[in-house]
Amino acid sequence: MAAAGARLSPGPGSGLRGRPRLCFHPGPPPLLPLLLLFLLLLPPPPLLAGATAAASREPDSPCRLKTVTVSTLPALRESDIGWSGARAGAGAGTGAGAAAAAASPGSPGSAGTAAESRLLLFVRNELPGRIAVQDDLDNTELPFFTLEMSGTAADISLVHWRQQWLENGTLYFHVSMSSSGQLAQATAPTLQEPSEIVEEQMHILHISVMGGLIALLLLLLVFTVALYAQRRWQKRRRIPQKSASTEATHEIHYIPSVLLGPQARESFRSSRLQTHNSVIGVPIRETPILDDYDCEEDEEPPRRANHVSREDEFGSQVTHTLDSLGHPGEEKVDFEKKAAAEATQETVESLMQKFKESFRANTPIEIGQLQPPLRSTSAGKRKRRSKSRGGISFGRAKGTSGSEADDETQLTFYTEQYRSRRRSKGLLKSPVNKTALTLIAVSSCILAMVCGSQMSCPLTVKVTLHVPEHFIADGSSFVVSEGSYLDISDWLNPAKLSLYYQINATSPWVRDLCGQRTTDACEQLCDPETGECSCHEGYAPDPVHRHLCVRSDWGQSEGPWPYTTLERGYDLVTGEQAPEKILRSTFSLGQGLWLPVSKSFVVPPVELSINPLASCKTDVLVTEDPADVREEAMLSTYFETINDLLSSFGPVRDCSRNNGGCTRNFKCVSDRQVDSSGCVCPEELKPMKDGSGCYDHSKGIDCSDGFNGGCEQLCLQQTLPLPYDATSSTIFMFCGCVEEYKLAPDGKSCLMLSDVCEGPKCLKPDSKFNDTLFGEMLHGYNNRTQHVNQGQVFQMTFRENNFIKDFPQLADGLLVIPLPVEEQCRGVLSEPLPDLQLLTGDIRYDEAMGYPMVQQWRVRSNLYRVKLSTITLAAGFTNVLKILTKESSREELLSFIQHYGSHYIAEALYGSELTCIIHFPSKKVQQQLWLQYQKETTELGSKKELKSMPFITYLSGLLTAQMLSDDQLISGVEIRCEEKGRCPSTCHLCRRPGKEQLSPTPVLLEINRVVPLYTLIQDNGTKEAFKSALMSSYWCSGKGDVIDDWCRCDLSAFDANGLPNCSPLLQPVLRLSPTVEPSSTVVSLEWVDVQPAIGTKVSDYILQHKKVDEYTDTDLYTGEFLSFADDLLSGLGTSCVAAGRSHGEVPEVSIYSVIFKCLEPDGLYKFTLYAVDTRGRHSELSTVTLRTACPLVDDNKAEEIADKIYNLYNGYTSGKEQQMAYNTLMEVSASMLFRVQHHYNSHYEKFGDFVWRSEDELGPRKAHLILRRLERVSSHCSSLLRSAYIQSRVETVPYLFCRSEEVRPAGMVWYSILKDTKITCEEKMVSMARNTYGESKGR
């Protein structure tokens, strides 16, 4: 096999390119040694330092970096495969592409596709260093390997690579050490403690020597600076000109591929590979890496010739390239580059053309005849890289040696030997003499040599494979050494492969299960033993892509994206954001999107503009070139929906003839749609399981479900026209029977005609659901709607003798237990409670009477406890369960739930019940009637019927007989009763004349235990799908999926504002606090938290309150808005408003409350409440309109003032007395004035009423000023102020004052969950002053 050519990469990472010389010339500029001294004092990088010191060290000691590029052309040619996409001009700019183009004419299948060129690879690197794959080549370019070797020259010279085409169609590439290196590795001693001690001592010695040298150089530097400060520059001096060029170093390039004639190739193969043994039985080509050379002058050609012949002993084709070290600002070098670039293309094309002609004619070519330009640049077209080639010149090699040189054409590229220099004409006198400069230079060289000897140069080989996309086939293998890895960061389209690692060349291979996951690499964690992926805490595997991780714990970060943070300005001095917004976002709510598997629904802003209010304060101007806008509009196409994008590809079917190829009752649709082949079902129909037609799943069965539609014998199909669309039809499927059989009443099973009995003597067929005793136990139950479904879950059989007293035979599987006698016929009267339904909306509250009250009276009898002992699934339910699979859609499962329910009843209470609700108009009326009932039943003890009479019977008697009391208390009482079942005649508490029944049929009263229907499903996958659909129907309205404790809505479940609404935000019900009745200045409100356990998350409640008077425009006056979370719980509210939170009867239910303590008496107030969720939605409003209690009145003081006014008015009233009476009446409040008038008229009306006397004594003007204040008293308060007695009292009511423990950051949008807010509550006593109104004292 011909040895593949190689080249040294001239990239910037190479340590050979641009290596500075350390060969000094007489009279150097004085600043160069000083600069070199500072560079040497700094710790240099290992590779750069090693290359810098290469001139003054031994050839085998410095660190080297070499890059070799190996073409795969010879191996691919031997495989006799066609390289797809190669054409004559494909490789005009790349050597690999040209070679592929030259090889393609003689290869079969050159017009194949890229997929046909996939190859199996087996890459093995026994040396430390990673393997990288980059699919950065075009399909017309030839794949190649790049070896980047770092280490000493002795180690690099032992590196070998082998490339071979295996018989099984695999391209094998192996990088290893030579036999001596392998032997050294295999026989290395296991215990190296003495050598390590010696190395440590030598290391300490070297550090000491280096420290002394550094101190010496520092002293020389200080001495030089002192001399420089004492000297002065000569008066006549010139500024030196910059050097036009410098001495350049040598670097070696390997040709990517050299095309040889057949005789030379055969002679080379026979002479080179006879002494080598193949590992697998096929000749393996083997190319050693050349050593580097030392620093040498260009004026010594014989030394160069000797070096070249030393390299040629390995039988390789080499090239010496001269690359100058240019300085910034050299105009001549730039000019040379520009001039050389013009002649580059012609020379490269002519060279490649002669290569192709030589290959076709099988004759060698004399490359030395070509006259290339001084420099050339070749840029290979790559997807992600573009490398410039160094300038070269071509000629015949001189002084070659070796047996191979006589048998084949030897191609050697080398650079020119001389470069012109431009000397400086200016002379600058240096203050440092030559002796000091020489000392500094020698010390620098010694220091560099010592530093270089201390550097560790381990041997590493990085193998990079450059291939076209989809070149590597699945099943390829890679082997790396322990500690190395496979780099696929630049592999855009990786293949499935096997990855192994080994400790050394003789150790067994260990499979790296995690590293070989190229197509589905684990995002976070990977188990090295199994290769399975896992996630960090707070993350969970993606449901679809198990190797990816999604957030499972979002903490406080859920909610809309905080775009408002971006809208505000930022002060660099203070480091804070300004409260005013500089920018304004324009949102398009229809383009909202979910963050991937998260709780956040994001509405991105479609435009960002300057806020009009801030435009006057800022100097920001946003402009855009109209030409750019037009060009962008011309070059881009916008599609509103995905269907618009699909429709741009044209029709999917031709529906003009033969229904577009759609079968049966499918309709042909020419428009392209997502997941549609063009054949769709008519509306309200769905395809059959086998896809042969469309049917109505709510009315028929599916004969193609795999279970014969649940039919016992025949499943028949019939095509019927749709009633709402005459052009469409549906396939109706039903069960049938063969001859001598008849369809059973269940519609699916068949009965023999001989066994069918008809007539009055035959057994009655299965009765209907409503006529079956305890039939609810055999049917499904919807736990959300609290209703029993018609779908029968369990089979109703009467094979066992299941009897109970006073009832016919019961169905099998039912266990009926009668309750004890002491629990039968018991009347229960609840405690009187405020009527919550009357504490919301427009409230008519009378502080003299109190809250409206309600009581409940309940009597239960004929009670039975019913349980399911054994269950047998019904045939229809079993057939439906067989149809359901884990792939069943949510719509199918929801249809099942709608028909059969979500649970079945396992235990329930049956019997009869009488429930009566007693509504009292006020708390005062309820208390008086209760006292009256107790008094009469106690005093009339001789009448047994009254003594044992229930309270409900006593009230009913009062309402029936119209035995009204003096104060008409019973007039506002209302009794509403509801009866379930029939009351037995044995219960005197509920029986009614004419409606007694000895053994009434018990009805369902209470469900004690339910079991989900998915427990009846055996398959775990189907069970999980059913559970998911059940959760969706319960919490997400069947339009979304439940994830943790929230709903991810479908794309169709969005409201008009573009926000998800599958989990509706319920309306909170604002009401007066039942435990704290309003006073003249204090009102307490409360509401139940509407946040469900799963679904919508409430972020805040907004409470608005305003005073509504006759003279107030309610539309213009909006009142005051308070945020429950930000204003009340955070403590920002005033002392007049406080927040609280308590729990209801169930601990999971939270009740929020707000107390207002500074309201005006006798004022009409309107309170409004709405909820805000974490996505910015607002619930519907809930309002409470209430007039506060009348102002407090001191009745004793009012009576004293009335007596004082009478005394002033009595007899002759002087001017002083008139003024005193006027001042006294004007100082009191309007309510006190009204009460003074009441007392004056009650006591002294016979001497003239208050109005007439005031006008007579004070005059019309002053009397009008006083009496006009009485108009401010409302009609409600005026009626109460006319009461005979008014007593003042102070009540002390406990109240929970709560405050948030969390401090919210200022200037940030806060979207937290209110229920999760940590608050601390403290119980305090609230004093409330009230007036008690009555006709007599003490009542």
UniProtKB/Swiss-Prot annotation:
Residues 1-49 form the signal peptide. Disulfide bonds join 514-526, 522-533, 535-549, 655-668, 662-679, 681-694, 703-715, 711-735, 737-750, 825-987, 916-977, 983-990, 1036-1047, 1049-1062, 1136-1158, 1190-1277, 1298-1321. It comes from the Eukaryota. One of its GO terms (biological process) is protein localization to cell surface. Residues 510-550, 651-695, 699-751 form the EGF-like domain. GO terms for cellular component: cell cortex; cell pole; clathrin-coated vesicle; early endosome; endosome; late endosome; membrane; perikaryon. Keywords: Calcium, Cytoplasm, Cytoplasmic vesicle, Disulfide bond, EGF-like domain, Endosome, Glycoprotein, Membrane, Metal-binding, Protein transport, Repeat, Signal, Transmembrane, Transmembrane helix, Transport. PANTHER family: ASTROTACTIN-1-LIKE, ASTROTACTIN-2. This is Astrotactin-2. It comes from Homo sapiens. The lineage of its organism: Eukaryota, Metazoa, Chordata, Craniata, Vertebrata.
